[in-house]
């Protein structure tokens, strides 16, 4: 059985790292309401973002054959228009941005996934509904996207599985 974290004498008790899930399945630390996190894995990598506010992180391995099937079902018309003019990699950048946003909001992928856009007319969007989006330079075969009220308050860790 794992031991509980110890506190220094005279200090408040160390937090518990147990998790619970919100109504749409987003995990959180009930004993640390001041610390938010988002985890993603794809291919041989996993990544975690931690912040003092809600945060969403998504990692996507660039695989073949997903673009048309997924974009026609889950993407906003503006995203589909943008992707018709773009490289295959851009599809994964938009998909990762959309997933990072729904992880940030906690809503998950549902029937509303096509109701918002992560693409401006000529580039990926910099924000959705006031939340900042950032494509994080990572690996040439992956797209990594972060969503938070302020992306400069987020710590990201990643490594191979």
Positions of predicted regions on the chain:
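Core catalytic alpha/beta fold that binds nucleotide/phospho-ligands
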Residues: 1-161
